[in-house]
Amino acid sequence: MSKLFLDELPESLSRKIGTVVRVLPSSLEIFEELYKYALNENSNDRSGRHKKPRIDVSSDLLKTDEISETNTIFKLEGVSVLSPLRKKLDLVFYLSNVDGSPVITLLKGNDRELSIYQLNKNIKMASFLPVPEKPNLIYLFMTYTSCEDNKFSEPVVMTLNKENTLNQFKNLGLLDSNVTDFEKCVEYIRKQAILTGFKISNPFVNSTLVDTDAEKINSFHLQCHRGTKEGTLYFLPDHIIFGFKKPILLFDASDIESITYSSITRLTFNASLVTKDGEKYEFSMIDQTEYAKIDDYVKRKQMKDKSMSEELKAKSKSKGQATDGTADQPSILQEATRQMQDEKKAGVFSDDDEENDQNFEAESDLSDGSGQESSDGAEDGEEAEEDDEEDDEEEDKKGQSALNRDNSFASINGQPEQELQYKEFKEPLELEDIPIEIGNDDDEDDEDGSGVEYD
């Protein structure tokens, strides 16, 4: 058997084959047969036979790759696609006529808007995600290496209507007519994905359901802003997603180096994710109630909290903010959270504390100097706040202000505490008596030195 074919191979490969042949001389014949087979296959490819689809599939190949009922694995009609294009399209899983491999495509009638081949290699990540404040909808999110003709690179995001999807499954005979649990649809779609070579996670599955991979443990989502765009930040077991207004951001959790908190107020704060390559992404207007979940996620993923780093302390000092520089100082965000909790315990934010609400209304009447009170106590408190921002417009009623003020305190549940508050307010103001001319001679009950000053 000739060794001439070795001269046609790369030098490194030729040496490796030579090493094997010296140990096992009979293997030379096998190598030569393999070489000839490869030549024949290459010749067949050039002649157009046995051509296999590549990731960057050409339009000519798609023309021969027809979709029919016989090669369709699964189909959902009228899906709302949000990315990479915004259209109502049909989602189809089918087997290619070219080589029998599974394909995902989005169709408008018979026209392909997007097709993804070689799903086992091309789909990088896929997940079901909840739609905030819309329990009847669910997102299907997918990222991929490339699609046919490389027309798009943005992730695929589509919205599934749970009721419509259930009805389609029943019409296709995939579910019994009495089934109402949408998780049955999710389970079926996930199984089809596994059969076609990739996995769709379901990290927000109901905790009452059996889920052996426990994906739901670290998963939550919250509303925030990135710049001027409002969106949803999803914290998943292995990824963090911000969407779904372009550009959609996808982070591998292992690529996040650290997190910092800033712009902290009593109600909101900002969080910045810093990747290992130094890129920083800031998300603002996050509700204070979300801090505990973010902090737990950060600790589980062993990310660094650099909110109290020396660099940020130096920036705080330059702005005149005091800090003692101790290593074990609790973060300002934790202190803000505790302060908010203490205020809630004290009843500061209690809408049910009618006594405090009434005290506030009485004090508001004094502060604006109007002394006027409507029959509706709840509306009176709101009017008092508005009067603080405007000049008094009804000076012709000055003569009745003192009498109305006295009556206002007697009308609020008759509580001694509020009367005491009025006296405490009035007495120091009696140090300076300002005479007020009253047009009505019948108001003999008005007190001198009422403490109300008019412009």
Curated annotation (Swiss-Prot):
<dbReference type="InterPro" id="IPR050454">
    <property type="entry name" value="RTT106/SSRP1_HistChap/FACT"/>
</dbReference>
<keyword id="KW-0238">DNA-binding</keyword>
<feature type="compositionally biased region" description="Polar residues">
    <location>
        <begin position="319"/>
        <end position="339"/>
    </location>
</feature>
<feature type="modified residue" description="Phosphoserine">
    <location>
        <position position="450"/>
    </location>
</feature>
<feature type="modified residue" description="Phosphoserine">
    <location>
        <position position="408"/>
    </location>
</feature>
<keyword id="KW-0143">Chaperone</keyword>
<comment type="function">
    <text>Histones H3 and H4 chaperone involved in the nucleosome formation and heterochromatin silencing. Required for the deposition of H3K56ac-carrying H3-H4 complex onto newly-replicated DNA. Plays a role in the transcriptional regulation of the cell-cycle dependent histone genes by directly recruiting the SWI/SNF and RSC chromatin remodeling complexes to the histone genes in a cell cycle dependent manner. In cooperation with HIR and ASF1, creates a repressive structure at the core histone gene promoter and contributes to their repression outside of S phase.</text>
</comment>
<keyword id="KW-0597">Phosphoprotein</keyword>
<dbReference type="InterPro" id="IPR044891">
    <property type="entry name" value="Rtt106_N_sf"/>
</dbReference>
<feature type="region of interest" description="Double PH domain">
    <location>
        <begin position="68"/>
        <end position="301"/>
    </location>
</feature>
<feature type="modified residue" description="Phosphoserine">
    <location>
        <position position="411"/>
    </location>
</feature>
<keyword id="KW-0677">Repeat</keyword>
<dbReference type="GO" id="GO:0042393">
    <property type="term" value="F:histone binding"/>
</dbReference>
<keyword id="KW-0158">Chromosome</keyword>
<keyword id="KW-0539">Nucleus</keyword>
<dbReference type="InterPro" id="IPR040770">
    <property type="entry name" value="Rtt106_PH"/>
</dbReference>
<dbReference type="InterPro" id="IPR011993">
    <property type="entry name" value="PH-like_dom_sf"/>
</dbReference>
<comment type="subunit">
    <text>Interacts with the SWI/SNF, RSC and HIR complexes. Interacts with RLF2, SIR4, YTA7 and histones H3 and H4.</text>
</comment>
<keyword id="KW-0804">Transcription</keyword>
<feature type="compositionally biased region" description="Acidic residues">
    <location>
        <begin position="430"/>
        <end position="455"/>
    </location>
</feature>
<feature type="compositionally biased region" description="Polar residues">
    <location>
        <begin position="402"/>
        <end position="418"/>
    </location>
</feature>
<keyword id="KW-0815">Transposition</keyword>
<feature type="domain" description="PH 1">
    <location>
        <begin position="68"/>
        <end position="200"/>
    </location>
</feature>
<feature type="region of interest" description="Dimeric region">
    <location>
        <begin position="2"/>
        <end position="67"/>
    </location>
</feature>
<feature type="region of interest" description="Disordered">
    <location>
        <begin position="305"/>
        <end position="455"/>
    </location>
</feature>
<dbReference type="GO" id="GO:0005694">
    <property type="term" value="C:chromosome"/>
</dbReference>
<dbReference type="Pfam" id="PF18215">
    <property type="entry name" value="Rtt106_N"/>
</dbReference>
<feature type="compositionally biased region" description="Acidic residues">
    <location>
        <begin position="376"/>
        <end position="395"/>
    </location>
</feature>
<feature type="modified residue" description="N-acetylserine">
    <location>
        <position position="2"/>
    </location>
</feature>
<feature type="compositionally biased region" description="Basic and acidic residues">
    <location>
        <begin position="305"/>
        <end position="314"/>
    </location>
</feature>
<dbReference type="Pfam" id="PF18469">
    <property type="entry name" value="PH_18"/>
</dbReference>
<dbReference type="InterPro" id="IPR013719">
    <property type="entry name" value="RTT106/SPT16-like_middle_dom"/>
</dbReference>
<dbReference type="Pfam" id="PF08512">
    <property type="entry name" value="Rttp106-like_middle"/>
</dbReference>
<feature type="domain" description="PH 2">
    <location>
        <begin position="217"/>
        <end position="301"/>
    </location>
</feature>
<feature type="compositionally biased region" description="Basic and acidic residues">
    <location>
        <begin position="420"/>
        <end position="429"/>
    </location>
</feature>
<dbReference type="GO" id="GO:0031491">
    <property type="term" value="F:nucleosome binding"/>
</dbReference>
<dbReference type="GO" id="GO:0005634">
    <property type="term" value="C:nucleus"/>
</dbReference>
<comment type="similarity">
    <text>Belongs to the RTT106 family.</text>
</comment>
<dbReference type="InterPro" id="IPR040993">
    <property type="entry name" value="Rtt106_N"/>
</dbReference>
<feature type="compositionally biased region" description="Acidic residues">
    <location>
        <begin position="350"/>
        <end position="366"/>
    </location>
</feature>
<keyword id="KW-0805">Transcription regulation</keyword>
<keyword id="KW-0007">Acetylation</keyword>
